[in-house]
Amino acid sequence: MLEHFPWLTTMIALPLVAALFIPLIPDKDGKQVRWYALGVGLADFVLMSYVFWTNYDISSTGFQLQEKFSWIPQFGLSWSVSVDGISMPLVLLAGLVTTLSIFAAWQVDHKPRLFYFLMLVLYAAQIGVFVAQDMLLLFIMWELELVPVYLLVCIWGGQKRQYAAMKFLLYTAAASVFILVAALGLAFYGDVTTFDIAELGLKDYPIALELFLYAGLLIAFGVKLAIFPFHTWLPDAHGEASAPVSMILAGVLLKMGGYGLIRLNLGLLEDAHVYFAPILVILGVVNIIYGGFSSFAQDNMKRRLAYSSVSHMGFVLLGIASFTDLGISGAMLQMLSHGLIAAVLFFLAGVTYDRTHTLSLAQMGNIGKVMPTVFALFTMGAMASLALPGMSGFVSELAVFVGVSSSDIYSTPFKTVTVFLAAVGLVLTPIYLLSMLRQLFYGNNIPPSCNLEQDNLSANSDQEAVCFGTSCVLPGNAIYDDARPREVFIAACFLLPIIAVGLYPKLATQTYDATTVAVNSQVRQSYVQIAETNPRVYAEALTAPHIPTTDFATVKVQP
């Protein structure tokens, strides 16, 4: 009986339906609402963990837990959801990060009902993006996610919250048009009209159409992944968003871009990917170096972490474009690893802001003695971000480096330059992170004081602005308190899997390796066919790739 139960639909419906009951909860100060929202988030995370543990086969490369029925037949729209090795780990990541972000927002008292309503709607939309197997359904879920994020930044942000929220909305909404165009182009090509992603993968598209749609999807997913030059919304959004919202922005929303590239660009447009892969490599290197230098130049703590995310997403691009099993596996692990690391760093940035009421690194310093636990947790998160051995970040970035270096598609000079430049960017990471720790917790600066009376006056001048890390204005005797048990628990929930995956990467890689190997095999077969058809033209490309003898075919190059 349970074999045919709509588990994935339930995962989406639970937070969405539960959000509708929030207005009915009799609650003035938000205490009951926050417990209700946390209970719903935790229940959904426990549900997905149970379902994947008991009903998901990690050795399978196909879609599992499939549910499909006609929804709006006039538009060819079906409710089609399923998971595979690419989506299942990201669903778990979304569940963990969003549940803990709800717990991190424990002291929100400004419009708490609306806040937790939007958080639960966002929870459902994130899961919907990762499990959708219908292109129109994917587009709907993609758009649904924009609204709560816009409102969460616009209402519970800093003084420039409206500018940051509008910039996020314009960037992502404009980019999502390319997803709709791609959906229509893929669906209506050929004799059969369908939006089902699995069926779209069976069509044989002309290379011109693939290149056009690939470019559009690269823009759409590049905005979400914060690829240069489409990244500028991210530092502004992080700089103005509250800590719980920043946790979701960095921990989950960025990963939607990487997921889309693997699912659609590699999965459906593999011929076009052969031509675009060198461009992805170049963009990845630019992201790594540009993000590193830009991060070092930031005085705002959250903007520094935002540019750090830009840099780390460059490794995802390198892995996706590597044409190797290890490289794509490293890209997946980088998304999962960064989702945990970025979430804990932004959470701890919010914890620090609660005490100091400033994000300016120049105004901080010498608070390590009064907040030793926060200092220790922040240091562990920073070490994970700079890829310290024993942490998940080290494994993912090493896999990408080895994957690119061992690729038999690119020429040796191209690989050498790529690895060297990426290594330069990697060296920048400890520079800007360790300098941030020094400015935060060391130095001779007097710890920043918080004038509660002045804070109240500032709040009155902008009544809709809510400046908080994980809370609003704290009592005077709590400004320099060390981490509370709730905050230690949240940080530990992120740091423990970071360390566990760093020590035993198979905990994560075994969930998706079968699928990423299948995706890479498909892409490599496309490369062989293209090179076999026109080896001279392709060999004259910028990267000067040579045509290897692969496991799939022996390529004969005509003189």
Swiss-Prot record:
Localization (cell) = Cellular thylakoid membrane
Example GO biological process:
aerobic respiration
Q: How does it sit in the membrane?
A: Multi-pass membrane protein
EC supergroup of this enzyme: translocase
Q: Which keywords label this protein?
A: Membrane, NAD, NADP, Plastoquinone, Quinone, Thylakoid, Translocase, Transmembrane, Transmembrane helix
Instruction: Kindly report the protein's main subcellular placement as a broad class.
Output: membrane
EC number per UniProt: 7.1.1.-
GO MF: NADH dehydrogenase (ubiquinone) activity; ubiquinone binding
- A GO CC term assigned to this protein in UniProt: plasma membrane-derived thylakoid membrane
User: Which reaction(s) does the protein catalyse, per the Swiss-Prot or TrEMBL entry?
Assistant: a plastoquinone + NADH + (n+1) H(+)(in) = a plastoquinol + NAD(+) + n H(+)(out); a plastoquinone + NADPH + (n+1) H(+)(in) = a plastoquinol + NADP(+) + n H(+)(out)
**TM region positions:** 5-25, 35-55, 86-106, 114-134, 136-156, 168-188, 207-227, 242-262, 274-294, 310-330, 331-351, 374-394, 417-437, 488-508
Quote the Pfam families the UniProt record gives. Answer: Proton_antipo_M
Q: Which InterPro entries match?
A: NADH_Q_OxRdtase_chain4, NADH_Q_OxRdtase_chainM/4, NADH_UbQ_OxRdtase, ND/Mrp_TM
Keyword check for Methyltransferase: no
Function recorded in the entry: NDH-1 shuttles electrons from NAD(P)H, via FMN and iron-sulfur (Fe-S) centers, to quinones in the respiratory chain. The immediate electron acceptor for the enzyme in this species is believed to be plastoquinone. Couples the redox reaction to proton translocation (for every two electrons transferred, four hydrogen ions are translocated across the cytoplasmic membrane), and thus conserves the redox energy in a proton gradient.
What family does this chain come from, according to its entry?
Belongs to the complex I subunit 4 family.
- Give the protein name, as stated in the record: NAD(P)H-quinone oxidoreductase chain 4-2
Give the species: Synechocystis sp. (strain ATCC 27184 / PCC 6803 / Kazusa)
Give the source lineage, highest ranks first: Bacteria, Bacillati, Cyanobacteriota, Cyanophyceae, Synechococcales
Q: Give the gene that encodes this protein.
A: ndhD2
